[in-house]
UniProtKB/Swiss-Prot annotation:
Protein name stated in the entry: Tripartite motif-containing protein 49
GO CC entries: cytoplasm
Lineage, broadest ranks: Eukaryota, Metazoa, Chordata, Craniata, Vertebrata
UniProt xrefs under Pfam families: SPRY, zf-B_box, zf-C3HC4_4
Organism whose genome encodes this protein: Homo sapiens
Gene Ontology molecular function terms on file: protein kinase binding; ubiquitin protein ligase activity; zinc ion binding
Length: 452
């Protein structure tokens, strides 16, 4: 083949980012190709759309598939380079003047066929050099994929922890205000209890804030270690075959150790101190709610903070997501336009539920609407996220960092004050009060759960 044509052919097999032959090449929407590791490293911090470095067109970086044809061609190009290298005079076996084609996996040396049969190497494990190099490169790529998945998980966790740290003081202040407002409705003799509960909340809030900072620092440090290890594996992967085999060493073992002890996000939880006489006061406004049941689509609600996890209702003994979920809505027959009302819902040990009140027009809308924090839905919900449950309220959408209720939850609706309060009945404590609700009466009770 003409040398000029050969150079053009080889040039098509070179990644424009690292300027080496492709390893695990991916072709993006615009048609340009890159090594997967190079693509990852260059666009790690851009979550969705990225610009191609070659043509500046935007592309999505999800579900990238290996370009098998390009990978095979790049592998052939490496074999040609290896053959040219091994055919040079200085690489010939000094004893037998034969081309070294064999790799000894025991002492990581290159041997000619005669040397591999010698007394010294006879019982060692041998492989053709090009086979051994490709096998080692594939092992590196597999380990890199594991590293990258952990790095992405750590990156997501770091974002969660960063957001929690940034918002934590405001969240604690909101809870303090809600509890103060609740005590203002109680008799004056509760002053000492109020003081104690507020002081405990402030103390716990400061402790958690400090722990969040430490957790965030650990994750940031782990991110640097994971990225550094990934870059080292990537560099090793791009080495010429002979260099790769002889420098391989303990790199896989070291990469395994990096994957151990991955820091996990905190599950911060503020104690909700009991308010003496809370339920007695609320029971003055007790009403009995009659429910109208209907089956709904399984994605009626979506909780964006917990990454698209459906709200539902399943028991702890049932494996999660083992069957097709069925959603059920229960609308209150009654509607409210003014006054104060209180009712309770038994949630037990279940999770994946939501209940509260909604503006009447919400009932008439498409049942596949999602919780997006917009006006009209005033709910408390509980979702199962991996191994833990999280509480949230809507309008606006907000995580509630308090213990999950395990029996009954009360709802207090004050139409004139434009507030919806949720209480843990067993603990006689305030979960949260949604202030400044954008009511558009009539208001209707709503309950949703999903069975799996």
């Amino acid at each position: 083949m003409n040398s000029g044509i050969l150079q053009v052919f080889q040039g098509e097999l070179i990644c424009p980012l690292c300027m080496n032959y492709f390893i695990d090449p991916v072709t993006i929407d615009c048609g340009h190709s890159f090594c997967r590791p190079c693509f990852y490293l260059n666009w790690q911090d851009i979550p969705f759309l990225v610009q191609c470095s070659e043509c500046t067109k935007s592309t999505e970086q999800i579900n990238l598939k290996t370009n098998i044809h390009l990978k095979k061609m790049a592998s052939l190009a490496r074999k040609v380079s290896l053959w040219l290298f091994l055919s040079s005079e200085e690489q010939m076996c000094g004893t037998h003047r034969e081309t070294k084609k064999i790799f000894c996996e025991v002492d990581r040396s290159l041997l000619c066929l005669l040397c591999s049969s010698s007394q010294e190497h006879r019982y060692h494990r041998h492989r053709p050099i090009e086979w051994a190099a490709e096998e080692h490169r594939e092992k590196l790529l597999q380990k890199m994929q594991s590293l990258w998945e952990k790095a992405c998980e750590n990156h997501r966790n770091l974002n969660v922890e960063t957001t929690r740290t940034r918002c934590w003081k405001d969240y604690v202040n909101l809870r303090l205000e809600a509890i103060r407002a609740e005590y203002q409705k109680m008799p004056a003799f509760h002053h000492e209890e109020e003081k104690h509960n507020l002081e405990m909340l402030k103390k716990k809030g400061k402790e958690i804030f400090h722990r969040l900072h430490l957790s965030k620092a650990k994750m940031a440090h782990r991110m640097e270690i994971l990225r550094g290890m990934y870059e080292e594996l990537n560099e090793m992967c791009h080495k010429p075959d002979v260099e790769l085999l002889q420098a391989f060493g303990d790199i896989l073992h070291r990469s395994e150790s990096v994957l151990l002890h991955m820091p996990q996000p905190l599950n911060p939880e503020l104690s909700a101190g009991p308010i003496t006489g809370l339920r007695d006061r609320l029971n003055q406004f007790r009403v009995h709610i009659t429910l109208h049941h209907e089956e709904a689509n399984n994605d009626i609600f979506l909780y964006e903070i917990l990454r698209s996890m459906c709200i539902g209702c399943d028991h702890q003994d049932v494996p999660y997501f083992t069957a097709t979920p069925r959603s059920f809505l229960a609308w209150g027959v009654q509607t409210f336009t003014s006054g104060k009302y209180y009712w309770e819902v038994h949630v037990g040990d279940s999770w994946n539920w939501a209940f509260g009140v909604c503006n009447m027009y919400r009932k008439e809308k498409n049942q596949n609407e999602k919780i997006d924090g917009k006006a009209g839905l005033f709910l408390l919900g509980c979702v199962k996220n991996d191994i833990q449950c999280s509480l949230f309220t809507t309008s606006p959408l907000m995580l509630q960092y308090i213990p999950k209720p395990t029996s009954r939850v009360g709802l207090f609706l004050d139409c004139e004050a434009k507030t919806v309060s949720f209480v843990d009945v067993n603990q006689s404590s305030l979960i949260y009060t949604i202030p400044n609700c954008s009511f558009s009466p009539p208001l209707r009770p709503i309950f949703c759960c999903i069975h799996f």
